[in-house]
Amino acid sequence: MTFVDDDEEEDFSVPQSASNYYFEDDDKEPVSFARLPIQWSVEEKVDGSGLGFYLRGRSDNGLLPLHKLVKAWRYDLSNFQPEISVLTKDNIWIKLEEPRKSYGELIRTVLVTLHSIQFLRRNPQASEKALWEKLTRSLRSYDVKPSQNDLVDHIGLIAEAAKRDRNLANSKFILAFLTKKPTKRRLPDEDNAKDDFIVGDEDTYVASDEDELDDEDDDFFESVCAICDNGGEILCCEGSCLRSFHATKKDGEDSLCDSLGFNKMQVEAIQKYFCPNCEHKIHQCFICKNLGSSDNSSGAAEVFQCVSATCGYFYHPHCVTRRLRLGNKEESEALERQIIAGEYTCPLHKCSVCENGEVKTDSNLQFAVCRRCPKSYHRKCLPREISFEDIEDEDILTRAWDGLLHNRVLIYCQEHEIDEELLTPVRDHVKFPFTEEQKVFVKEQRRILESHVGRDKARLKVKDPALQDTCGKASKNSFRSSFPSSKDGFSTKKHGLVSSVPDHSRKRKDIDPSIKHKMVPQKSQKMMEDSREAGKNKLGVKEARDAGKSKISLGERLFSYTQEPNPVKPGRVIPVDSKHNKTDSIASKEPGSEIPTLDNDSQRRLLAVMKKATEEITMGTILKKFKIQSTMSTHSTRNVVDKTITMGKVEGSVQAIRTALKKLEEGGNIEDAKAVCEPEVLSQILKWKDKLKVYLAPFLHGARYTSFGRHFTNPEKLQQIVDRLHWYADDGDMIVDFCCGSNDFSCLMNAKLEETGKKCLYKNYDLFPAKNNFNFERKDWMTVSKDELEPGSKLIMGLNPPFGVNASLANKFITKALEFRPKILILIVPPETERLDKKKSSYVLIWEDKTFLSGNSFYLPGSVNEEDKQLEDWNLVPPPLSLWSRSDFAAKHKKIAEKHCHLSRDVGSSKLKIVEEEANASLHPLGASDGMCDDIPMEKDELEVAECVNKILVSEKIDTVETVARVHQSDHLSRRSQLKKEGKTKDYSGRKLGKSMDSNNVDWKSNDMEEDQGELSRAPESIKVKIPEMTSDWQSPVRSSPDDIYAVCTSISTTTPQRSHEAVEASLPAITRTKSNLGKNIREHGCKVQGTGKPEVSRDRPSSVRTSREDIYTVRPSPENTGQKPFEAFEPSYGASLSHFDDGLAAKYGGFGGGYRMPDPPFLPDQFPLRNGPNEMFDFRGYSDLDRGIGQREYPQQYGGHLDPMLAPPPPPNLMDNAFPLQQRYAPHFDQMNYQRMSSFPPQPPLQPSGHNLLNPHDFPLPPPPPSDFEMSPRGFAPGPNPNYPYMSRSGGWIND
């Protein structure tokens, strides 16, 4: 036998590895292990005196929990994957395996760095591209691709590792990386959650999945550069030409594109880009390549655009007729008129071979379009000479490329010679409306503006601010006129983003379009002439100074100059623009207008103005001015307009749809209509309509809550949410409402928590002023930092964020909330919101109620109807209410949910199911020593049980008219009047607001019958019954008799027949089937019965201490019990659905000891089996209820109405009615202490020839009803007690003896 010493036993107990791990600090906040000191070698010991972190996880293959304090870490690169270990305070190394999923994101950058070091150590000559490809494969489990930004976070670790490892120090990438010392940069595919909300971010916008889908839908518009016909980083023109261009030389360097010649800063300064052709409305004819005016507003247009929505080419009418070679002059003139009218589809939309249209869904019938002339082919009709690859034997060069155009082939037809260097035809096909002389002038102006010396000289030469302003404008405008210009708004850059700072608008004048292209050079020439003229005006300086002093001081003039929006007086105007650009106003120089020499006071005041302007006008203030609020983000042009919608596309698509519709109305064929307007255009225009509708809502309807899709939760629903949520709050917690609206939630929560003795903190955020300012802060939720709130272990966040399109805003608000790691998130969000358990966050769904907010649960703030009443919002698809708990709090919160019946399986379930569960839970509530029934006082408030029963009746779609019998006639109140006395405002448990409720009381919810029917038709509410604990409080000095268990409280009937006999009892008190009601209301001598939330009802009690049988059943007739309509039979399905109540009751009272037991079933023929199917219900004697119903004789309401079907006992079936006399029939099944079970309806009284009341002259009480199944006899008779029963008369009350 092998013995193990103590040291080896200790080794077995030491954890060797940790899985599902994470690290936390003393505040139980997750931290990265990289913050610990690193131990590079065995010789180098780490000082463990510093504060360490706690390692949490599982060890021993996940079987044992792990909780260790660690002080250092190390890594090992010798294996296939980097291995990380941490050193405990006991100097034991623990290897780290797989981290917890939510913790993996926190240490992702460390893992990327270690994988990089390992790869570069083994491959010193590896390139940067090879590194990222390797890391992408190794770390593909993470959503974010590895990048240089991950290494920047640990540049110190990389530098130290390179010092200690020779192979790593020889890595080319490491040398370049450490030499360059890079900083974090924005990556094209990097996601930034704040971009959708904060316009001021310097980072570029990253499209969401939905935006990428929109880009795919938008690809049928041109997506290649108009100069080089290649893709890449392109800038789209906002005008009608629908073209795109490479903006910088770098963007077009792969295809040797001349590009637009901008630099990166200039591109970022562009808001909306219009090419020079669209800016001046001077376009090229796609056939002859000559420029011509396209401005048809003055009737002088020369070129006209093709009407197709996706075609941006212009044509001279005579060029089209000449190309088509129409021999008939009349046909040519008709075609020209059609072209001028804007109803012409160019030859590009017909195959040059078969002259048929395009079918994009069929690859063979897709078009191959030439980029130099209006010629197209179907793929199947493409000539052999237009090849996708070089054929050297036949001297055929590549003329076709697939994949550059959406569902099309890009070709150069044989009419265009291919340049061997460019591999495309000569690129002289794009002409802008400016001359070569202007290009030279613009280059000179650019050189001067970019030179510091040039700028200083310009400032010395131009002293007049008016002249300086006009010269600046002229230079700027001449620069923009020579290059593709920009306008206010946003650029449509296909794969990039520009700054959001708007450009200043410039006023222009429209001119004759026929001479626009001749006037551009004149502007620069006349500007220079004005500058020279300004230099000659120095002779009048003294006169101007004297005149200025005599009229107004220089400081006032300067102040008025800075305040005036247009300080330059209009003089001569050089018109150089069109619809998009308006003309500059250049003031001619007036004598004496030059600024005189400044005195000391003026200089001081001027410097003060400059200093103030420098302090106040900063980039931060400008960005803040144009900042878009969070709830407006889905309506901003950054998210909607700039990427997919341009003015040219919208106008062209609308015009195409109108033309196509006109063609169809005039009898044209569908093919011609499709050539004008493709099916994809119709789909796209509908998407644009939806997007623009959302975007324009704040402008069309004002900046109101509803314009941003906001709606508020009704206070009644908020109160019910508070009643659920307050159980989870602890002292010192902080309740955060990140979109508080009217700020009702925190107020209600505060009142509830104060009532329960808890003190919490509150933070409420919104962009709009709240109705009340209880801890309210008008602030964007996206700007809230962790320093402003408590630690996550004390945070409870919610509740109703703005939804946004496809829950986009809800997802953003939740993502922001997860940064604080609150212990609880309670949310009202649409169903399409991304679930927290699908995110990489450690949150567990505690419960979810999908029907709680159905119906009119919301209202529209500030909106009223014609009666000045608040408009309510009815949800077609109600948003679920859900409560999420952080994983380390989940067990605690689940226990709270179970205790208060909040779990998902309970929330939103039907009343019937809840009552059944409560009944099953209360079958045997007492121990063996407490088995006697007379120790259990059992009385229930009548109205309360009537509430529960009535709700169940409503859920079964049975129209009921209930009558609540009281001991006194004055106590017969209808349910509606009773509720009016109590007040209508109740919390979720049915209690009146502002009143406390005893913990042992039963939760119930009271509504009017119509409200019940409406609520239950939408979603059944839960009837929650609390089970009281068995304490000494259950015993009372005034004891109820054991017979009180037969008390019945309510008489419910759909109809009550008019009988000639009065009932002995007006209504029998009924017991509930749940144990929770036991001992709640104890009947005492000369006292009142307390009901849950109900007014006290006085009862006449006899003087005896022990409750007798007489005082239970002695009732007085009431007017409400008489003169009502005949009763209609219950449906069998109703009794079947409720039979389980009696099963629970029978088990309950059949198991309390020898004093009570259920009767033995009688012998029945074989045709009466005990139970032969789930839908056929039997009582304990085996009688089927399939025959139940009302026979020829009707049951009078004077007997208290038909008893509650749940509470009434069943009779024997018709088969036994005439077989034996009444008493003999039941004799074999009784003993002295047992009663036979009664019918579901009260017993039929003996008929009397006259009178309206069935009198009981001896005032004997009626026999008590034993517990029963829910069956009845067609005749309604029920057996009486054993005649030998000591408390009753010999007849058992059936006759007056």
Curated annotation (Swiss-Prot):
SMART domains referenced in this protein's UniProt entry, alphabetically: PHD
Feature: compositional bias, Basic and acidic residues: 526-547, 969-990, 1096-1109
UniProt PTM: Phosphorylated by WNK8.
Keywords: Chromatin regulator, Developmental protein, DNA-binding, Metal-binding, Nucleus, Phosphoprotein, Plant defense, Repeat, Transcription, Transcription regulation, Zinc, Zinc-finger
Motif Nuclear localization signal 2 in this chain: 492-499
Top-rank lineage group of the source organism: Eukaryota
Residue ranges, annotated region (Disordered): 471-547, 562-598, 969-1017, 1085-1109, 1260-1297
Bias (Low complexity) ranges: 475-487
Disruption-associated phenotype: Impeded use of distal polyadenylation sites at intronic heterochromatin (HC)-containing genes (e.g. histone demethylase gene IBM1) resulting in a lack of functional full-length transcripts. Abolished expression of At4g16870, a transposable element (TE) of Copia-like retrotransposon origin, associated with methylated status. Strong reduction in RPP7 levels due to altered H3K9me2 levels in COPIA-R7. Disturbed expression pattern of NLR (nucleotide-binding, leucine-rich repeat) defense genes due to abnormal H3K9me2 hallmarks; some being repressed, including RPP7 and RPP4, but many being induced.
Subcellular location: Nucleus
Gene Ontology MF terms: DNA-binding transcription factor activity; histone H3K9me2/3 reader activity; histone reader activity; sequence-specific DNA binding; zinc ion binding
Motif (Nuclear localization signal 1): 445-452
Residue positions of motif Nuclear localization signal 3: 610-617
Binding-site positions, Zn(2+) 3: C306, C311, C346, H349
Stored Pfam families: DNMT1-RFD (PF12047), PHD_NSD (PF22908), PHDvar_NSD (PF23004)
Binding site for Zn(2+) 1: C237, C241, C275, C278
A GO biological-process term: positive regulation of defense response to oomycetes
Coiled-coil regions listed in the entry: none
PANTHER family to which the protein is assigned, alphabetical: PHD FINGER-CONTAINING PROTEIN DDB_G0268158 (PTHR46235:SF3)
Reported function: Cellular antisilencing factor and regulator of genome DNA methylation patterns involved in the regulation of chromatin states. Together with SUVH4, monitors repressive epigenetic marks H3K27me1, H3K9me2, and prevents DNA-methylation at CHG sites, affecting especially the expression of transposons and developmentally important genes. Collaboratively with ASI1 and AIPP1/EDM3, the AAE complex regulates alternative RNA processing (e.g. alternative splicing) and epigenetic silencing (e.g.
Record note on quaternary structure: Interacts with WNK8 in nucleus; this interaction is involved in developmental processes regulation but not in RPP7-dependent disease resistance. Interacts with EML1 and EML2 in nucleus. Component of the ASI1-AIPP1-EDM2 (AAE) RNA regulatory complex composed of at least AIPP1/EDM3, ASI1 and EDM2 and may contain CPL2, AIPP2 and AIPP3/BDT1. Binds directly to AIPP1/EDM3. Co-associates with AIPP1/EDM3 to histone H3 lysine 9 dimethylation (H3K9me2)-marked chromatin and transcripts at a critical proximal polyadenylation site of RPP7 to hamper proximal transcript polyadeylation/termination.
Protein name: Protein ENHANCED DOWNY MILDEW 2
Native species: Arabidopsis thaliana
